[in-house]
Amino acid sequence: MSAAPRSNKMAIIMSCFAAFGGFLYGYDTGNISGVKEMPYFQRQMGNLQPDGTYALSSGDNSLITSILSAGTFVGALCASPLGNTLGRRFGIIAGLVLFCIGVGLQTGGKDLAIFVVGRVFAGLGVGVTSCLVPMYQSECAPKHIRGMIVGAYQWMITIGLLIAAIVVDQTKDRNDLGSYAIPIGVQFAWAIILAGGLVLLPESPRWLISVGKDEKAQVALARILGVAPDSPVVAEEYAEIAAQIHHTRSLGSTSYLDCFKSTNRNRLRTFTGLGIQALQQLSGINFIFYYGTQFFKNAGLENPFVITIATNVVNVGMTVPGLLLVDRMGRRPLLLIGAAGMFVCHFIVAGVGSGVSTDNQAGQNTLIAFVIFFIAFFAATWGPLAWVVTGEIYPTATRGKQMSMSTASNWLWNFGIGYATPYLVDKAPGSAGLQSRVFFIWGGACVLCFLFTFFFVPETKGLSLEQVDILYRKSSILGSNKVRKEILANNVFDDDKEAYKSAKTEAQTEHKEDVKMRDL
């Protein structure tokens, strides 16, 4: 009897819809750069200057930007217990509730203290969703397009950044609270849309199996695969997932401490996740999106808001080639190409910016061009692929804990870079005054990106999450592509898979016989 044909339609719909969580991340990140430069916001939150204008101090500037990342760091760590207890879907919804509290405080807050508290709550929510959304996607996506689907999370981040820049540009000249309350308050709508959709989508079958809800897992698998619950396709998928979870648990406990043990190469996996998320931040991308408006303004550009929108358009557009190539070229080649390209762009920007005056139009055009080239390289490679890699390298039994730590690493470095950048760039007393020379730092970090990818990131293209686990057990990093091909060619899976598959088939047969007996 041939297996019933499967459909990827539901898996693609649910995974792509969940990617809308990235829109919240991107929009919230993108609006703050412009909001801080609004004249009304500076009068409301800033300090009176000797020339009669208002401005935020370097300390307040750093606090407003980086405090969100402090909240997201804590939120990401809380995502594991939330996601493991409530499930992936309702864990995300819990994060959205925290996010909405933060949006409300920022929208209504008329002094800096309330605004900052609102940023903390919003950060908690973004931290939870930024961990659980890629996890939910990776656990539900078909393996042959998993890279593209999880990468769509980053694409939605870029779209959020772009929409935020456009909205801020439209309200920046208002002389009332609406100048910043409108671009911040509209985030209520994004959260409601995502929460409403998640209620209707199936839960992650891998989470359901991990907590012993096998029947619900089979129903969820059937919805995702577009087949009946008693289909052989469901039995096949269920057996592979259950066997991998059984193997992981047979090795011992699944505590946070176990994430750093050599068993099942968990230490290497945890280090890889922590490292790739840290290096994504150290690439310098959020310097552009947190301080881009101010940087372009200092470079002598008449309308830095327009350039900010242009950089966001490039970010959105160039993420698409990355999504199309990740499941064709693979993870490692794209990450290596991206690191090399970003390195070149950073050193050109640093050299031009530090060697050419702001009055030199050709020099400033070159600076802008290579900032845009840098964004293009990042958007097509390290932007989406950091989430793809961390979403697929962990075993199911400890995925929540390891994913929360890697996401927390992203936000910890985000916080550090966000807080330190004004002191690195500004010429104010007590600051380093590096200005464009800060790009030498980002360029040096991109050398680390290249080396880290070469020695620590395996090639996982085309493998199921369970086969990725087998890859780690059977292969070195440098030999991962060869072993990956062997796993695919020989359809390698855990030894326990057939036992789980047989047990499920027998249970279904007994159930059908019971039904027939009752009918008699």
Residues covered by each model-derived region:
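Alpha-helical transmembrane bundle of multi-pass membrane proteins
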Residues: 1-225, 229, 239, 243-520
